[in-house]
């Protein structure tokens, strides 16, 4: 497994290729990724690298976290994320060092994990892509209803997992194999093709794609 980065969603824009094609991209700020802890198989039972991003005042964090950051010699961050890595990768990373956006290359595929935008209580048409009922021809006040949710006295219940109305969004989700369009090392920005989960200002986790498509 390879190392990833913590990012913050700035927004969406577009970039133009040399041929003049417009590509919609999402801009992520991945600057200031600092190594807080490096875990090894000998000491912790598995290999991992713990990163933090952002800055937070010491009086805004617990004493335990304050000591954790002080031991690493880094400023307190707003978010901490641990990435599982291979043993050879973790041995080359030093505590207190900063991981650059140049970890990713243009054209590579990445997986982005974030919290999707909350939509509140939604119906089955919006939540599960159901089709609405007929607008007329005998249909009265049943235009957007889901229809039957069960059978008869046998089994006499609604099966678990039945697609019904309910809360939509505000859940962790991962979008896989997003193409890296541009890397701005000077400003610590990452330009990804298309959209990623979450609204502006939300935190996301980026790591190399796990399910790389076969060529």
Swiss-Prot record:
<keyword id="KW-0699">rRNA-binding</keyword>
<dbReference type="GO" id="GO:0022625">
    <property type="term" value="C:cytosolic large ribosomal subunit"/>
</dbReference>
<dbReference type="InterPro" id="IPR000597">
    <property type="entry name" value="Ribosomal_uL3"/>
</dbReference>
<dbReference type="InterPro" id="IPR019926">
    <property type="entry name" value="Ribosomal_uL3_CS"/>
</dbReference>
<feature type="compositionally biased region" description="Low complexity">
    <location>
        <begin position="131"/>
        <end position="144"/>
    </location>
</feature>
<dbReference type="InterPro" id="IPR009000">
    <property type="entry name" value="Transl_B-barrel_sf"/>
</dbReference>
<dbReference type="InterPro" id="IPR019927">
    <property type="entry name" value="Ribosomal_uL3_bac/org-type"/>
</dbReference>
<feature type="region of interest" description="Disordered">
    <location>
        <begin position="131"/>
        <end position="150"/>
    </location>
</feature>
<dbReference type="GO" id="GO:0006412">
    <property type="term" value="P:translation"/>
</dbReference>
<protein>
    <recommendedName>
        <fullName>Large ribosomal subunit protein uL3</fullName>
    </recommendedName>
</protein>
<comment type="function">
    <text>One of the primary rRNA binding proteins, it binds directly near the 3'-end of the 23S rRNA, where it nucleates assembly of the 50S subunit.</text>
</comment>
<dbReference type="Pfam" id="PF00297">
    <property type="entry name" value="Ribosomal_L3"/>
</dbReference>
<keyword id="KW-0488">Methylation</keyword>
<keyword id="KW-0694">RNA-binding</keyword>
<keyword id="KW-0689">Ribosomal protein</keyword>
<dbReference type="GO" id="GO:0003735">
    <property type="term" value="F:structural constituent of ribosome"/>
</dbReference>
<keyword id="KW-0687">Ribonucleoprotein</keyword>
<comment type="subunit">
    <text>Part of the 50S ribosomal subunit. Forms a cluster with proteins L14 and L19.</text>
</comment>
<feature type="modified residue" description="N5-methylglutamine">
    <location>
        <position position="153"/>
    </location>
</feature>
<dbReference type="GO" id="GO:0019843">
    <property type="term" value="F:rRNA binding"/>
</dbReference>
<comment type="similarity">
    <text>Belongs to the universal ribosomal protein uL3 family.</text>
</comment>
């Amino acid at each position: 497994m390879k190392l990833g980065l913590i990012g913050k969603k700035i927004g969406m824009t577009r970039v133009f290729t040399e041929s003049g094609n417009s590509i919609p991209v999402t801009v992520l700020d991945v600057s200031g990724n600092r190594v807080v802890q490096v875990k090894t198989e000998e000491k912790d039972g598995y290999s991992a690298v713990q990163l933090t991003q952002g800055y937070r005042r010491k009086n805004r964090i617990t004493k335990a976290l304050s000591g954790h950051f002080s031991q690493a010699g880094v400023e307190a961050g707003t978010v901490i994320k641990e990435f599982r890595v291979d043993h050879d990768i973790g041995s080359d990373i030093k505590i207190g060092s900063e991981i650059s956006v140049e970890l990713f290359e243009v054209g590579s595929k990445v997986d982005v994990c974030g919290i999707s935008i909350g939509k509140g209580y939604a119906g089955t048409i919006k939540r599960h892509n159901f089709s609405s009922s007929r607008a007329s021809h005998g249909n009265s006040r049943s235009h957007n209803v889901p229809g039957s949710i069960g059978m008869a006295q046998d089994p006499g219940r609604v099966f678990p997992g039945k697609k019904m109305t309910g809360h939509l969004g505000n859940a962790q989700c991962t979008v896989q194999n997003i193409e890296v369009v541009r890397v701005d090392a000077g400003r610590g920005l990452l330009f990804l093709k298309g959209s990623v989960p979450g609204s502006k200002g939300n935190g996301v986790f980026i790591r190399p794609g796990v399910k790389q498509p076969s060529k």
